[in-house]
Amino acid sequence: MNLLIKGGRVIDPSQGIDANLDVLIADGVVLELGQGLAAPEGTPAIDAGGLIVTPGLIDMHVHLRDPGLEYKEDIATGSRSAAAGGFTSVACMPNTSPVIDSKAIASYIINKAKSEALVNVFPIGCITKGGKGESLAEMGELKEAGCVGVSDDGKPVCNSELMRRALEYAKGIGITVISHSEDLALVGEGVMNEGFVSTELGLKGIPWAAEDIAVAREVYLAEFAGAPVHIAHISTVGSARIVRNAKARGVKVTCETAPHYFTLTDEAVRGYDTNAKMNPPLRSAADIEAMKAGLADGTIDAIATDHAPHHPDEKDVEFNVALNGIVGLETSLPLSLKLVEEGRLDLNQLVSLMSCNPAKILGLDRGTLKVGAVGDVTVIDPAKEWQVEAAKLESKSKNSPFLGWKMKGRAVYTVVKGQVVYQAG
């Protein structure tokens, strides 16, 4: 597909570009960047004057629920939600039914995405067979099938020797290991952050130590094995400190956090709102500050949504039995832009966190507008104001703690391989 994007502020940290430029895409790839570009007659054009033009945003942690849990979300609806949020690529986690632990399931997702998805869908395979934490999955086969990482997300690999072997094997074949880091014994029957609010509400708490101890284990295993590891959805002061210190001594560790962890505290649980129930849980104001500081100083490498759709029947129940997770694809960008408005990040940092870095971590040929690169582009209006309404969310599920919130900033065009797959109304 051919497309000319004219006059926008192009921000591409992969090339050190921050300038008003045109972007010309031909046959689905970036052909030229420059001022006053001419396109062949009949080429569609976007007037991006006053808008921000970036490499397509990448969410490296989503749950598309397909196969087996399509009543919550499927590849078609999840990709529509991604496109509406400005994401041109998503990596989908393997805790489906059946789980993504075989070439057949990975191939199913890739083939279905080719026919139904508006955006690029990259599967993440399981670390262990069946996601049971007992023996390693066939990582080589998963990589051959198109998986860009492995994870038992939803729960940790509890056996340290097994995790060590996973890191060593993954290093050998060049695939990213993504750790869901928590100590399940400490989590116990906890349903929210352990602290004043949990005590006041009479709910069992999950201590910050459950995350910190598990993150520390992964760091030491990666250091011992000389292998890279990526830590999913960090949320605590301690886990940020552990990763920061590990990076300083050369450990190959990367990590992500999610917008809810730098926006909401456990105060959001008051009223027993199950849309504020997630794993890891919402933490304290000090933890929010740690996430913002970690994003600013490079400790945290990526912003990922952990988009986790659930049917109303799984959320409209008592807090203790409600399932964990929220939808986040359509609210991630404005919540992240707020960090720019607050002066905690600049736009170049934000684009790195939401596009360039996720591409590097997963080894994707995305996250750049270099000539010859895939023509995936996000066009953003940072001043556009809108309200989060359940009826207007593209996701099949509506379990968001941000319903009713007034947002500022959103993607107005999402372009995949030169084709506009989303345009804001």
Swiss-Prot record:
The keyword Thylakoid does not apply. InterPro entries: Amidohydro-rel (IPR006680), DHOase (IPR004722), DHOase/Allantoinase_Hydrolase (IPR050138), Dihydroorotase_CS (IPR002195), Metal-dep_hydrolase_composite (IPR011059), Metal_Hydrolase (IPR032466). GO terms for molecular function: allantoinase activity; dihydroorotase activity; zinc ion binding. Transmembrane segments: none annotated. PROSITE patterns: DIHYDROOROTASE_1, DIHYDROOROTASE_2. It catalyses: (S)-dihydroorotate + H2O = N-carbamoyl-L-aspartate + H(+). Its EC number is 3.5.2.3. The active site is at D306. One of its GO terms (biological process) is 'de novo' UMP biosynthetic process. Binds 2 Zn(2+) ions per subunit. It is an enzyme of class 3 (hydrolase). Zn(2+) 2 binds at D153, H180, H233. Pathway: Pyrimidine metabolism; UMP biosynthesis via de novo pathway; (S)-dihydroorotate from bicarbonate: step 3/3. One of its GO terms (cellular component) is cytoplasm. Substrate binds at H63, L64, R65, N95, N279, H310. The keyword Metal-binding applies. Its cofactor is Zn(2+). Zn(2+) 1 binds at H61, H63, D153, D306. Keywords: Hydrolase, Metal-binding, Pyrimidine biosynthesis, Zinc. Catalyzes the reversible cyclization of carbamoyl aspartate to dihydroorotate. Belongs to the metallo-dependent hydrolases superfamily. DHOase family. Class I DHOase subfamily. This is Dihydroorotase. The gene is pyrC.
